[in-house]
From Swiss-Prot:
The lineage of its organism: Bacteria, Pseudomonadati, Pseudomonadota, Alphaproteobacteria, Hyphomicrobiales. The record marks D73 as: Transition state stabilizer. Substrate binds at R23, Q24, A25, G26, R27, D73, Y148, S203, H318. It holds the Pfam family URO-D. This is Uroporphyrinogen decarboxylase. Its EC number is 4.1.1.37. The keyword Cytoplasm applies. Pathway: Porphyrin-containing compound metabolism; protoporphyrin-IX biosynthesis; coproporphyrinogen-III from 5-aminolevulinate: step 4/4.
Amino acid sequence: MKRKVLRVIDGETVFPPPIWMMRQAGRYLPEYRETRKKAGSFLDLCYSPDLAVEVTLQPIRRFGFDAAILFSDILVIPHALGRDLRFEEGKGPLMTPIDADEIFWLETEGVAKRLEPVYETVRLLREQLPDETTLLGFCGAPWTVATYMIAGHGTPDQAPARLFAYRFPEAFEKLLNDLADVSAEYLIEQLDAGADAVQIFDSWSGVLDEDCFERFCIRPVARIVQKVRAVYPEARIIGFPKGAGMLYAGYREKTGVDALGLDWSVPFSFAAALQEEGAIQGNLDPLRVVAGGNALDEGVDTILERLGQGPLIFNLGHGITPQAPIENVQRMIDRIRGGKS
């Protein structure tokens, strides 16, 4: 029997909708925090298949989500490209900013093969997950990954990357193309290892104007999709251009993704129009899970009422926060699964 999440990606309406959460294996879970301590560094956790499997399975055991998403990080790609990368408490990811000249020296040949521990994690997960649970792989979109490579860290509006793109257009285009090519190989390897579907995270797409969104977000993601589909024509792909606003319109058609992840700022009338084209995923404000109570219940109910009649994967509009109480996550799940169509 086809897994629920895959049925929705294929355009079927399933009610109650399947549910998973971005960052569902994360710091809000005490068992995650314990495993994280054992690993040493965050990257060690990402590159240790047994530990990465454990933290991926933790939210499945606790909550019975309909999908498990591979535990890793979008920045393993630049790390595999030879960029230094470290994660510091309270600061997030840090790396030495790349300059325009260095981009022309980047070599992409065989880079995806350096991420074998990630593929081993996928293989082990497919063996250990319940049959009904969808296994999702993922990568970061080239624009979002490039913003960290250029600034060396996250910034409020990723101004360093935008300025770099304006000043060094040729270097920036090469960087996006290189990242797209390696990311496509990376996703193909995940599908080889047993992933049922993959998601492309473009967390910083919302800081771009319309022209740059087309060049920096849509074209590189379309390049990834085309390369993946050359190997896996039936590959199921979710695109998540967070903060895209009105530019969500046309994203699915232009990139070729099957399902569209929405953030919580998307009006329901617009979301419903996007849903007429195919599956959508989202889009509860993560802070409603932190708040709990009526704020959570009303958020869940509204999504079910406005979007539950079409192909919907229930998710948050971004990753769950470390402050989210576990009991509120369970309350959300119970309310979704007890929902009325």
